[in-house]
From Swiss-Prot:
One of its GO terms (biological process) is proteolysis. The active site is at residues 94, 277. Belongs to the peptidase A1 family. It is found in: Secreted, Extracellular space. GO terms for cellular component: extracellular region. This is Pregnancy-associated glycoprotein 1. Pfam families: A1_Propeptide, Asp. It is an enzyme of class 3 (hydrolase). Appears to be proteolytically inactive. Its main location: secreted. Glycans are attached at residues 79, 130, 348.
């Protein structure tokens, strides 16, 4: 897996902003090439669904909690600016969180000094709240302050925008990250209490023509992928979008009918929930079902990862995800990824979502989003899907 990083700030149309994206290496691939991945996974057990269901009990009543999680396989990053004059940052555009955070110049952790940091004294529009925030990733507690300033994405400006400024980042994987922070595109219910997410602020301030954004992930791994804000460019898909109503308004959550392989139901047997997550590279589900799927594709657990024969990418059948009575095939070339060496391939399925609650839940990450152009419609609380061109 690799990171998508912005090439240029924006390409403007009359009504929407289109942000071009391309790929660089993921933290996982970076560690693998340095022969550090195996030891890292042993020392830091990897929980891919850490960010979902984060409880406020992790922090005291006087401290706000901002969602933070594992970044080993995060996929989408792009450039924004904060402050006046603007300070540039590369951030993850994440649909499963709602906060914005970047490192502060007061952070001296190794993960901070290897990335861009925000200097409040250089911005004439910065306002401090003197409010502490705690970010709770799996391998350490990141602390910081809540501030307010002007945030710009393309030509859209969010005035007096709340964001977290990390002052300590004792999180090992962040040292190898190709991004500085996170910009969440989820619902306000996921945000720090008393704050407004960037997208909602832009909407309230009349910056966005339409309350929608969309993701197109090109099959060309190096170029062509884009994030659209404020509208939809029909050139990135064919036919009509298939609309799916949200089943909850926090994550971009929908109802999933079933998952089948060669006509046999292998997951979501009685209907379940699915979260579309641009901040995840994988297809995540309950461990029991995932274990069965790994056996189906003959994946073997080697060196803390599920490895698959590379020839299976062209021989195995599609998994069919049925959503709102529409079938969405996921072929083997998508659910089995190539490794950094020709003979190494890996499963893009992973378990652990049973910890989210009693109801069966699946996470549809890059594997799914790369196949289907996706519109996130806040105006009508729905998601639009169509085969990407």
């Amino acid at each position: 897996m690799k990171w998508l990083v912005i090439l240029g700030l924006v390409a403007l149309s009359e009504c929407l902003v289109i942000i071009p994206l391309t790929k660089v290496k993921s933290i996982r691939e970076n560690l693998r090439e340095k022969d550090l991945l195996l030891n890292f996974l042993k020392e830091h057990p990897y929980n891919m669904i850490q960010k979902f269901g984060l409880k406020g009990s992790l922090c005291s009543p006087k401290i706000s909690c901002l969602r933070l999680w594992n970044y080993l396989d995060m996929v989408y990053v792009g450039n924004i600016t904060i402050g006046t004059p603007p300070q540039l940052f590369s951030v993850i555009f994440d649909t499963a969180s709602s906060d914005l955070w970047v490192p502060s110049n007061q952070c001296h952790s190794r993960a901070c000094v290897t990335h861009r940091s925000f200097n409040p004294t250089l911005s004439s529009t910065f306002q401090s709240s003197n409010r502490t925030v705690k970010l709770a990733p799996h391998s350490g507690l990141v602390s910081g302050l809540l501030g307010y300033d002007t945030v710009q994405i393309g030509r859209f400006k969010s005035e007096n925008q709340a964001f977290g400024l990390s002052q300590s980042e004792p999180v090992k994987e962040l040292e190898n990250a190709f991004f500085d922070g996170v910009l969440g595109l989820g619902y306000p219910s996921l945000a720090i209490q008393g704050t407004t997410p960037v997208f909602d602020n832009l909407r309230k301030q009349g910056q966005i023509p339409e309350p929608v954004f969309a993701l197109y992930l090109s099959t060309n791994t190096k170029k062509g992928s884009v994030l659209m804000i404020g509208g939809v460019d029909n050139n990135f898909f064919t036919g009509n979008l298939k609309w799916v109503p949200l089943s909850a308004r926090n994550y971009w959550q929908i109802t999933l009918d079933r998952i089948t392989w060669r006509g046999v139901v292998v997951g979501c047997t009685r209907g379940c929930q699915a979260i579309l997550d641009s901040g995840s590279a994988f297809l995540l589900g309950p461990s029991r079902q995932i274990s069965s799927i790994q056996k189906i594709i003959q994946a073997r657990f080697i060196e803390n990862e599920y490895q698959v024969r590379c020839c299976a990418r062209t021989t195995l059948a599609d998994f069919i995800f049925t959503i709102n009575n529409v079938q969405y095939p996921v072929p083997a070339r998508a659910y089995i990824r190539k490794g950094s060496t020709p003979r190494r391939c890996y499963s893009n399925f992973s378990g652990g979502t049973e910890s989210l609650g009693k109801e069966e839940t699946w996470i549809l990450g890059e594997v799914f989003l790369r196949l289907y152009f996706t519109v996130f419609d806040r105006g009508q609380n729905r998601i639009g899907l169509r085969i990407a061109v």
